[in-house]
Design a protein with these regions (language model features):
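Short, internal strand/loop/helix patches
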Residues: 165, 180-223
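C-terminal motif of bacterial Sec signal peptides marking the signal peptidase cleavage site
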Residues: 13-16
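A short beta-strand-turn-helix
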Residues: 110-131, 154-157
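Sec-dependent signal peptide recognition
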Residues: 2-10
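Hydrophobic beta-strand anchors of alpha/beta hydrolase catalytic cores
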Residues: 132-133, 218
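Extracellular calcium-associated, cysteine-rich motifs in secreted modular proteins
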Residues: 19-103
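Thiol-/selenol-based redox modules, centered on thioredoxin-like
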Residues: 214-244
Length: 244
């Protein structure tokens, strides 16, 4: 979510648009332009433009002040969209992505899956990064073999706008992973990037439709969520560098 340029721009917009509705909603324009009635870091004028409550510092009740959410590009009106416990930055383009599909050259579909912190993670929140989606299971030894290496890649290329998201579809019992299972995977390989529960491979199957999936299966998205390749094994540094 993009922060408004300035309250002055808001005033100019209102003057240009006019109308009774604007007069009703913004009858406080004579007030101090910097007024922040609820102390949440957003001026009352900006709150009106965002549609947040100027008298409630946490409009959506998710535990984060409205100003903090705007600064970190989450949605202050959606109680399920807030800064990640894992510390992964949210791109300000998340609400601009227009999905076309999960085939090479298309713009990847949004997904929302539970991460290792028990929070909903949205793919499009990483719209400003190169994303490696790694489809894996606990019983897949090759998946485990590459997991630590992917963490190394993440550490090496994070500052260049790269992130890994592991799509864990089954635990050691071939059941849908619990949050505890996700945490165990994280601990096993010292992972700091997102690991999410892809129950029954629901997301993985959208990248490899009508085909027998051979794990590990890795899918690369360029910045802007364009699908670069799908279902590839043996990822090397050059695969990442060519998509940064």
């Amino acid at each position: 979510m993009k922060r408004l340029a300035s309250s002055a721009c808001v005033i100019a917009l209102l003057i240009a648009c006019g109308g009774e509705e604007a007069d009703h909603q913004f009858d406080w324009l004579g007030a101090d332009p910097g007024s922040d009635s609820d102390g949440d870091g957003l001026s009352d004028m900006d709150e009106a433009m965002y549609g947040t409550d100027p008298d409630n510092p946490d409009t959506d009740g998710d535990g984060f002040k409205d100003g903090a959410e705007v600064d970190q590009n989450s949605d202050p009106k959606n109680g399920n969209h807030f800064p990640y416990t894992g510390g992964w930055a949210i791109g300000d383009c998340w609400d601009d992505i227009e999905s076309t599909g999960n085939e090479v050259g298309q713009i990847a579909d949004q997904f929302e899956l539970i991460d290792q912190h028990g929070e909903q993670l949205r793919l499009h929140d990483f719209c400003d990064r190169t994303v490696l989606l790694s489809s894996a299971t606990f019983w897949c030894q090759p998946c485990m073999d590459e997991a630590a290496g992917f963490q190394d890649f993440y550490e090496d290329y994070e500052e260049e706008g790269f992130i890994v998201i592991t799509l864990l579809s089954e635990n050691a019992d071939s059941s849908t992973p619990t949050v505890e299972d996700l945490g165990a995977w994280v601990d096993l390989f010292g992972i700091t990037h997102p690991v999410v529960r892809d129950g029954r491979g629901s997301v993985t199957n959208t990248f490899v439709p009508d085909a027998q999936i051979v794990l590990p299966a890795n899918h690369m998205l360029k910045k802007g969520m364009e699908v670069s390749f799908v279902a590839r094994r043996d990822i090397v540094a050059a695969d990442i560098e060519s998509n940064l």
